[in-house]
From Swiss-Prot:
Highest taxon of source: Viruses
Keyword vocabulary terms for this entry: Coiled coil, Disulfide bond, Fusion of virus membrane with host endosomal membrane, Fusion of virus membrane with host membrane, Glycoprotein, Host cell membrane, Host membrane, Host-virus interaction, Lipoprotein, Membrane, Palmitate, Signal, Transmembrane, Transmembrane helix, Viral attachment to host cell, Viral envelope protein, Viral penetration into host cytoplasm, Virion, Virulence, Virus entry into host cell
Gene, per the UniProt record: S
Family, similarity comment: Belongs to the betacoronaviruses spike protein family.
Protein's organism: Human coronavirus HKU1 (isolate N1)
Region feature (Fusion peptide 1): 905-926
Extracellular membrane side: 13-1300
Further details from the record: Isolate N1 belongs to genotype A.
Gene3D superfamilies noted in UniProt: 1.20.5.300, 3.30.70.1840, Spike glycoprotein, N-terminal domain
Motif KxHxx, chain ranges: 1352-1356
Native organism taxonomy: Viruses, Riboviria, Orthornavirae, Pisuviricota, Pisoniviricetes
Chain positions of site Cleavage: R760, S761, R904, S905
Protein name listed in UniProt: Spike glycoprotein
Signal sequence segment: 1-12
Amino acid sequence: MLLIIFILPTTLAVIGDFNCTNFAINDLNTTVPRISEYVVDVSYGLGTYYILDRVYLNTTILFTGYFPKSGANFRDLSLKGTTYLSTLWYQKPFLSDFNNGIFSRVKNTKLYVNKTLYSEFSTIVIGSVFINNSYTIVVQPHNGVLEITACQYTMCEYPHTICKSKGSSRNESWHFDKSEPLCLFKKNFTYNVSTDWLYFHFYQERGTFYAYYADSGMPTTFLFSLYLGTLLSHYYVLPLTCNAISSNTDNETLQYWVTPLSKRQYLLKFDNRGVITNAVDCSSSFFSEIQCKTKSLLPNTGVYDLSGFTVKPVATVHRRIPDLPDCDIDKWLNNFNVPSPLNWERKIFSNCNFNLSTLLRLVHTDSFSCNNFDESKIYGSCFKSIVLDKFAIPNSRRSDLQLGSSGFLQSSNYKIDTTSSSCQLYYSLPAINVTINNYNPSSWNRRYGFNNFNLSSHSVVYSRYCFSVNNTFCPCAKPSFASSCKSHKPPSASCPIGTNYRSCESTTVLDHTDWCRCSCLPDPITAYDPRSCSQKKSLVGVGEHCAGFGVDEEKCGVLDGSYNVSCLCSTDAFLGWSYDTCVSNNRCNIFSNFILNGINSGTTCSNDLLQPNTEVFTDVCVDYDLYGITGQGIFKEVSAVYYNSWQNLLYDSNGNIIGFKDFVTNKTYNIFPCYAGRVSAAFHQNASSLALLYRNLKCSYVLNNISLTTQPYFDSYLGCVFNADNLTDYSVSSCALRMGSGFCVDYNSPSSSSSRRKRRSISASYRFVTFEPFNVSFVNDSIESVGGLYEIKIPTNFTIVGQEEFIQTNSPKVTIDCSLFVCSNYAACHDLLSEYGTFCDNINSILDEVNGLLDTTQLHVADTLMQGVTLSSNLNTNLHFDVDNINFKSLVGCLGPHCGSSSRSFFEDLLFDKVKLSDVGFVEAYNNCTGGSEIRDLLCVQSFNGIKVLPPILSESQISGYTTAATVAAMFPPWSAAAGIPFSLNVQYRINGLGVTMDVLNKNQKLIATAFNNALLSIQNGFSATNSALAKIQSVVNSNAQALNSLLQQLFNKFGAISSSLQEILSRLDALEAQVQIDRLINGRLTALNAYVSQQLSDISLVKFGAALAMEKVNECVKSQSPRINFCGNGNHILSLVQNAPYGLLFMHFSYKPISFKTVLVSPGLCISGDVGIAPKQGYFIKHNDHWMFTGSSYYYPEPISDKNVVFMNTCSVNFTKAPLVYLNHSVPKLSDFESELSHWFKNQTSIAPNLTLNLHTINATFLDLYYEMNLIQESIKSLNNSYINLKDIGTYEMYVKWPWYVWLLISFSFIIFLVLLFFICCCTGCGSACFSKCHNCCDEYGGHHDFVIKTSHDD
């Protein structure tokens, strides 16, 4: 629980801050509080209290609460004065820390004045800062009652009370409030005014204050409890001033004895009336630890292992890096230029010192609290670095800063990391000096025109919604598209290079053509379809700023009056932000988050509790504080060269510090743990003390922590022995207090050891002796079997076997939306389901517990595996998870851009360009005529309705040819005039082609218009007929309704209908029936859900059992060798390996399994000489060759019986217990006949139908004649059918246009160059020659092996 601390460290605490009076105040010295000679004796319940709401009878319990330490002393904090008050009375040690609480013993001063009894004692005040913004608890005697208040007092600087019996020259003054203070608690309690002592028990826990009281030394009883929600840090006993009190009168002496409380475990004993009669502080002594361990005030004789003992430190070693600069955190926090939450600022402080007390005082702190860290531990601690974030707080959003809040400040501005160790500071600055820096950190907002907010200096901007965009986002539409829009034209502008224009599309809606619709409408916050909006809502993460405000894209384009054509947005286009002032009471409220990195592992240190660097003590146990890391250890100086200049601490693999380099002396040290050992206590019921054995510790180490009186001590083979005489040369054959390794603690009564005490100056009732148990030479005729002889088989030979085992330790998590599972989206079902109470909540709670249990189980399994287990990666198992051969195409389908695509010939697409044109019937005939030869253009002129036509498309070569002909005809007239005829014909025929195409389209349009007009006329006639028919229907229906109304009136009058409306009755019945059916469905589905959850619980129980079994097998089989047979595999365990598997662990066990056995006679025990019994230890007594021998239980190996393999018994008798013969009841309960039971319950139930008669003649039954209207509608349908439009078919023809001549020329040249290069490679290079040589050799005749012939010539 986070407790907000409104105080400075304890060194700054004072009693009040209001100067109520200056009369008779001095600073004369006074004595320190007295220390009591008597101590807290809890043996009869002193210092204990009764547990709330619980009663215990005749029992002993262990209870952990807030108790004083047994044997602790009291301090007397009472102060008594006459006229003067000393300023030293209001400082330490009288002003004390409250911590967990206090137990006080108060003397009740009883005075008789004028035959009136006055009960007087001092007033105690418990609080924190003792001013009117925190609660102070005051316990004050007043006129024979206890007046207890918890109010926001303004305490005086020098508070005091006065005597009521004899009065005082001073006026009582301990608080000053102009008006009635705010109080949480105010109540009077009676107490026994005639008692001598009063006892008070005050403690606090989790923000709640508890008070207990008693008027005797018995346990205190509950007085009251009060939740404050904050810590009380100090307490103080007010001085009591009286007139002329006699100092020699004991009855007039003030005493207020106080001792602190701490959280301790007590053993409490209750009698048959529920009264605490005895108590034991479990950690006060070794004997009390035995009492608590056995829950007995008188433990049995025995040896008890107690909590470990560690040698206590004898010195302190303190180290800090010297001469580090001050962090100056307060200067950064007090900077008057404060950011807003939108652009919060961060600064990192490292390698410096800071004083938290001074810091909190300099920044006008409102509150300071920490998360995942105790704020009180910051004082004196060191950190690797401290990261500070700050921003001004909008007054209306202050609640958003609560940890875990999802308000605007944490969702869209600054996210507080609740998983890290951090502290939250709320402070303020004078508003007159503060200027809020409202800066938008979003780069994409600023790119499109966001400049500033134009707000006042105290207005704090914060984001309500954040939006993220990709790098190609642009909010403006493309200008060319916008110009084509005739309706809903979007604003447009030029977007930056590398960005995409706003997504828009043009459609036809009703009679509006080119109606444009763009994305992100009406704005990104309330977009119709968020998926089509490029602006995505986002939440800020830890350490992140808001990605940007949303932009209304309808307000982005070329701004009015601007010559800039780039995409910009107007000021009001940016959405999702708001602002508020930070000023209250003329101060601006600011929030700062302290993130603590590397706690106790750095050089950024708080110097609040700064201590000077000390000497490094070696070879002794010391407390150390090394650069903020604290602990205990023994330093040994070593020569180490592995420290770099920036390193000074040495760690092991587990993160424990094991060495350090001293920056002061430049020496290096290794750190070893302080000497520690286990403590064994030997206790005998007749003794008043214990014999202690500090195992593996020398007495010289132990004596550093223990003050000896008359106890003897010595070093033994087992360790240091206290309170026993060293008599190891003396042996005993029987021992009740065995210490192990052949040693025993023998108890002697004081009478038997009196002679020995005369010879030794220091002696004890215990002796440390050698233990030699009875060892008999076994004679066959003196030994008898105990319990009979039995024949068993013992293994004599084995073989190694391996076995795989899979154990499930985890399971997939299941979550169910109960309401949706039962009712889907049916509203009526949800309403009825709400009447089932918390069923769904219970289901979700159970599943959450199941999932939490899964997490916990998995964590435990992981912890077990992480501690000393190596997961084998070479197990040859039968579990294969090869997914390479799994074909998912049948599930996924075709993926990629080529799915569903079709194409023409590759060469056609490569060599030609495609053109599509409308064909009314002559284009296809023209192409069939030309056959691809463009020179036949005019020869293939087509005739359409007697008109010469050509297709309106020309290729590049045709255009070139006709242009050349026209040019030649124009250059040399009249001789070349004939050359222009083809051009003229070409133009005229193609114009004819366009004309006939338009003619056909025009005719089609006329046909459509005529047919549509006819259809409208038919529809009109049909609607008229329908209207007439509906009028007739309405007339008949109205008349029937009138008749029905008359019938219902008769029913109401004659039969006394329960409702005036039959429809209402039917609707209610239907609704009731529907609810019944819904209820049945809900019951069925809830039953199914309950069965499923029950199955989940059953399954998780199996998983939990499997996880527990897996952890047990990891610990017993993998980490060690199990003694259990068939637990780790099949047989006697050798070793096991473990491997991760899906939802579990896979074990490979190796064991040896017996394959041959020997049958022997065994006995459960042997009786020696008729009175001493022995039993085998981890084996059997076997009769081998008429001799009794011992053999192990897992392997036949006879050996002599000795004290190492037997257990001794005091008797030879055997106690038998007969097993009860109890069987499970498997009988099926017998039920009575169903029909007879039904008749028993319903034998008198009879339903009689009422005699109902109706006057049907009063109903007006009218028949409708709609023959004429039906014929008229039929004629309209026929007319619509005749409106079929036989439009002229206009085909679409696809033609190919050849490339120009120069393209073919370029292709030819490229082909020729390729052939030349190929020829050069094949014929003019060595590669080509080698190829020809190969081909030549292929044709040679092969006739077998040919020897090489070498021809040589020489002179004889």
